[in-house]
Every structure is written in structure tokens, then in C-alpha cells.
């Protein structure tokens, strides 16, 4: 792992790089390395959803760091500043293997917090790594048996805009239409963390090949992911956004029947992008769970 030292205050994030499978570069933001407050507590590793990047965890990461924890928000392969897969392998198994590489490089107990794709990755990574390395798991609006219609809406949004936008304002309009329950920001400047300007157009900062591997559909792996979750002996928290069309109440009930030790919290003002929709409520729940 290499580090761009940046600022030295414990509450400030700095950019770090890990090595994934096949030596892929995985970039993250890190808070509180070597801070005395974090020495006896697990590291928190934040894993974003498909088409997102580490900046979706900016507020939550800062809140956890201000609580004294060692925190890392990681860009998955093919997302953000991490390397793209030369073979376009974005299967949950490949993503999980990358996370396991990061866990071994950290060499200390970790709490995994995963949203959507990151949650499925976390289930498999926690199962493979074992309870000595992964001590707790937080699943953010994802269960192995999620709703196909909600997943299809996400993919449709990503496919529709794969050719980029004329301007940041056009991108902001697309996001606003996709997330009508969110208040539209006054300025689209915040989207620059998720977009890259190339030849006069703004493109999402993820590999388009992420969408073109049908054999990597997590629905083909439902049984494997369910079995992995059922075999976990660590504390698990499932968080659902009440407005979500990806995780249904029936999906929650099914998961809790199969993983009865898991805890469940529903955020009334959030959808599938729960951490961003109601960050204060989300972060409060997560901080309390991690602190136990």
C-alpha cells in the first residue's frame, strides 16, 4: 500500500493505494491512520455501489473518523480512480477477491460497510476472510434476493447516459430525474467527483464494460451469496431505505428469516442510495452499531 501523505491532522483524509487481484491499483481515502483513538478499534472499510465511487462515502467517512475510527473509503475496480479490469471482470467474486487483498494488506480487524454492489461484495469477502479479519458487517439497501425491477432501473439509468453529457447541468438534470425524492443541489459542481471531462463531454467515472458482462449478473449467484450470509457468525446490520425499489419488505423478511441474528433498521426518508439520501440518520445508526 502506498500513501499520498497530504495533511497530517487525524480528521483529514488522505489518498492511499492498495493492490488488488492481478496487481490492479485500488485507490481510497483514508482517515486516522496511526491515530491513538483508533489503535484498539477495528478499521472501517466503506464499499460503494455500482457506478458510484469512494466520494459517495465522504460525509459518513468523515463522521466515523471524527468519532476516532480508522476509516477507508475504497474505489472498486473499474470505478473512480482505481484501475479498470483488462478482462472486464467485474464479477462479485473478483470484487470480493480485491477486498480480501486489501484486508490482508491492512492486517487488522475490519468492519465492512457495503452499499448495493459493495454490500454483496462484503458478504462474500466476510465469508471468505473469516471473523478474525471481518468483525462486523453493515449491508446498505441490499440483500441477495433484491428486486429485479429496481436493479433494472439502475442499469437503465447507467446505460442511458453512458455516452456522456454536454454539461454538468445536463448531468444534474439526469440525476434529479433519477432521484426525484432528493432535493436538487443549487450547483452541479459536486458532480465533478463522479464525472470526467473528455473531448468536451462529461462522462461517468467508471468503466462502461461494467455493464456489458451479463454472466456477472448477481442474480446468478443468489444461492451462493445467501449461503455465505447464513454462514456468517459476526454481527450484521441491514439498513433499508423505505423508499427503495431495490430491497422490498419481503426481501428484508426473507433475509432476516435466513439470517435471524441480523439486525434491521429502516430509514423513512431514504431510498436505495440511503447514505446520501438521509446521511445524518444513516451515520447515526452506523456509528452506534460500530461502537458496540
What residue ranges belong to the model's regions?
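Catalytic histidine-centered segment of alpha/beta-hydrolase-like enzymes
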Residues: 267-283
